Swiss-Prot record:
GTPase that associates with pre-60S ribosomal subunits in the nucleolus and is required for their nuclear export and maturation. The keyword Nucleus applies. GO terms for molecular function: GTP binding. This is Nucleolar GTP-binding protein 2. The gene is NOG2. Residues 688-704 have a biased composition (Basic residues). Residues 674-687 have a biased composition (Polar residues). Residues 132-145, 507-527 have a biased composition (Basic and acidic residues).
Length: 720
């Protein structure tokens, strides 16, 4: 058998080279080897054995370490030493006196109580020692854990006398009598003031029946509260949405206390929604009252005609600036059912991203919505805190329960009649005037019978259907068709409860004016100091949130004494504020607006006015002005669509308009140069389904010189 050419080593000089298991091609007699590599182990297996045996010290037969392991200290390094006798080694490194500690504790307490101060950086201090909760009614010390009973009493007692607050039976009786007298005095004070059933309920704590119908337990399930805690844990800013008609009644006090104690690093903001259903002075008073505990913003949720949108977005931008170390912040919306949480999110996004309905319980699970590149919104289902003070009727009147699911809705009408003025019911349902109004079950029966007959809610035999009428009244109550609001906590200075003389009233008004003037001067001085400090340090000043509450359009018509207005403080001119901030915020970053359809920073000035939405009901002069502006806009759009070459009159008119726009761009140059579309109401200038045919718009004499209805432009040429 012959040999092939591959068998000849001389003909094939590379025959002796083989590829090792380690991946390197080496010759048979190469000198380059890895440590540990021999005939039995290649380089890879040698390194594996070294890994398994490594990290251990090498010892001899007696157990003494011959070679120390890697990163192991030798015995010589731990020789006995002697510390130099110096006071600096054994003295206290940081010493503080008790007076300085008390001063720091007081300042810390004041800053923590301030809702407008934000903790940006936490110092490494023993905060548990600085916060004295036992003095201010906080948690009691666990005395059983610190001093057990066996170590205090009995044969194994470690002290001679136990620490007891009461030493005898007489002292125990005196303390109980004093507490009972204090409770009786508090009750008598509440009854004498006559603040209503809510304050008395706080004192007496009425109990509710344990066997309640399941429909009255809406918003209290474990699933709903699980969704709430998901939102609270995921949010950096928590917005509590309140109903402007009853803010304190729709406030979840346990959730607020939980945020104060357990989640103090999260920011709480109150949003007073549905401000169009109450008078403006009520909104102003509630905003002033709630601002003492947390930042409060008045809001009206509407995609086309909202109020407070710019202020809320501006506040959220301030929080995003404070948390500049985070990539984004999350804003959670919580509150009672049917308070408008999802509607506020739709208003901020200017489109329907959350399902909304005028009935409670529409939102079932939480939902994430992107507002900006750095701001996310979280929608939460409505929650109802379990309280012994709320009866079934209170739950229904707060809008928690769906009215159509109530078995006996007529039983809640007597409480409704106590909260609504009779004049509003007469005006809403066309009832006959009754001196003194309606009270109790008899009054409720009379009202429901009259409403059922008037609306055609009848049973067999012509009997009025009181349950159907009660459902209709409750639905109107929840949707705001029946005027109602809870008066803010103020001093009664007018009306039937006012017994103060005119001289005293004038003195009080003068004193209030002086206080307001002093507050204004102090505020201006602080603002000047902030501006000067910002210029020195090179820090950009954050624009404050201002709201013209007097410009809120109220949909409900109130009577004279309910619609009264008080001048809380002097209104700040919005244009002046915009001028100042335009000079200071020229270098403002616009990256946050990349993913926003409507930023809303100056939305208050661009929102529709009442004249644009309802031109027929507006005043004559204002309506005429608004219609002229609309006519100009319509004619400009028509010129762009129909004519290629504008006439001389049109050029002159456009120059005048351009000059006006240049004056506005001097104030808000950055806003006017963007390509964002302004809000406009389609139904004010369009004849939808021929319903707007009778609307007469004042014609501009400089626009058309010939017939009133004669068309111009390309369309006219085509018709000819």
């Amino acid at each position: 058998m012959g040999k092939g050419k591959n068998h000849d080593r001389k003909a094939n000089p590379g025959f002796g080279k083989v590829k090792s298991k380690s991946g390197t091609s080496t010759g048979e007699f190469t000198l380059k080897r890895v440590k540990g590599e021999n005939f039995y182990r290649d380089a890879k297996s040698a390194s594996r054995v070294k890994m398994l045996n490594g990290g251990k010290a090498v010892r001899d037969r007696d157990g003494k370490i011959v070679e120390a392991a890697a990163f192991q200290k030798g015995e010589k390094e731990a020789e006995p030493g002697r510390v130099k006798p110096d006071r600096r080694w054994f003295g206290n490194t940081r010493v503080i006196s008790q007076s300085a500690l008390d001063h720091f504790r007081t300042a810390l307490k004041e800053q923590k109580a301030d809702p407008y101060s934000v903790l940006l950086k936490r110092n490494k201090l023993p905060m548990g020692l600085l916060q004295d909760d036992t003095k201010d009614g906080g948690r009691r010390p666990h005395i059983v854990e610190t001093e057990p009973f066996g170590n205090t009493f009995g044969p194994k007692a470690q002290r001679k006398r136990p620490r007891l607050d009461i030493g005898s039976i007489e002292e125990l009786g005196e303390s109980s009598a004093a507490s009972a007298a204090a409770a009786a005095a508090e009750t008598a004070t509440a009854e004498s003031q006559g603040n209503g059933t809510a304050d008395l309920a706080d004192i007496y704590h009425p109990t509710t029946s344990t066997a309640r119908e399941p429909i009255y337990a809406k918003g209290t399930s474990r699933r709903i509260w699980g969704e709430l805690y998901k939102v609270l844990d995921s949010s950096d800013v928590v917005i509590h949405v309140l109903d402007a008609r009853d803010p304190l009644g729709t406030r979840c006090k346990p959730v607020v206390e939980y945020l104060r104690k357990e989640k103090a690093h999260k920011h709480l903001v109150y949003v007073l929604n549905k401000v169009d259903l109450v008078p403006t002075w009520v909104t102003a008073r509630w905003v002033k009252h709630l601002s003492l505990s947390a930042p409060t913003i008045a809001f009206h949720a509407s995609i086309n005609n909202s109020f407070g949108k710019g202020s809320l977005i501006q506040l959220l931008r301030q929080f995003s600036v404070l948390h500049s170390d985070k990539k984004q912040i999350s804003v959670g919306f919580i509150g009672y059912p049917n308070t408008g949480k999802s509607s506020i999110i739709n208003t901020l996004k200017k489109k329907k991203v959350c399902t909304v309905a005028p009935i409670p319980g529409e939102t079932k699970v939480w939902q994430y919505i992107t507002l900006m590149r750095r701001i996310y919104l979280i929608d939460c289902p409505g929650i109802v805190p379990v309280s012994a003070k709320d009866s079934d009727t209170d739950t229904v009147l707060k809008g928690v329960v769906r009215v159509e699911n109530l078995a006996t809705p007529a039983e809640h009408i007597p409480a409704l009649l106590e909260r609504v003025r009779p004049e509003y019911l007469e005006r809403t349902y066309g009832l006959e005037h009754v001196e003194g109004g309606w009270h109790g079950e008899e009054g409720a029966t009379f009202v429901l019978t009259a409403i059922a007959k008037k609306s055609g809610k009848l049973l067999k035999g012509g009997e009025p259907d009181q349950e159907a009428a009660a459902k209709m009244v409750l639905n109107d109550w929840i949707r705001g068709k029946v005027p109602f609001f809870v008066a803010p906590p103020t001093k009664p200075e007018s009306g039937a409860d006012a017994h103060v003389s005119s001289a005293t009233t004038e003195k009080v008004q003068e004193q209030e004016q002086k206080e307001l003037a002093e507050e204004k001067e102090t505020k201006e001085m602080l603002e000047e100091q902030e501006r000067s400090l910002g210029k020195v340090l090179g820090i950009k000043r954050v624009k404050g949130v201002e709201q013209p509450i007097s410009k809120i359009v109220t949909m409900t018509k109130f009577l004279g004494d309910d619609a009264r207005r008080y001048v809380e403080e002097e209104e700040v001119d919005v244009d002046d504020v915009d001028k100042e901030m335009a000079e200071e915020d020229e270098d403002e970053d616009e990256d946050d607006d990349d993913d926003v359809e409507e930023s809303g920073e100056d939305q208050e000035e661009e929102e529709l006015a009442w004249d644009d939405v309802f031109p027929e009901e507006a005043a004559g002069v204002d309506a005429a002005d608004g219609e002229e502006v609309e006519e100009d806009d319509e004619e400009e759009e028509g010129d762009e669509d129909d004519e290629d070459v504008p006439s001389a009159k049109q050029l002159g008119k456009r120059k005048a308009i351009d000059s006006d726009e240049e004056e506005q761009t001097a104030i808000k140059a950055k806003r006017m140069t963007t390509n964002k579309q302004k809000a406009s109401n389609f139904y004010t200038h369009a004849n939808v389904k021929n319903r707007n045919r009778d609307r007469k718009v004042p014609k501009n004499p400089g626009k058309r010189s010939r017939g009133d209805d004669e068309p111009t432009g390309k369309k006219a040429k085509k018709r000819r």
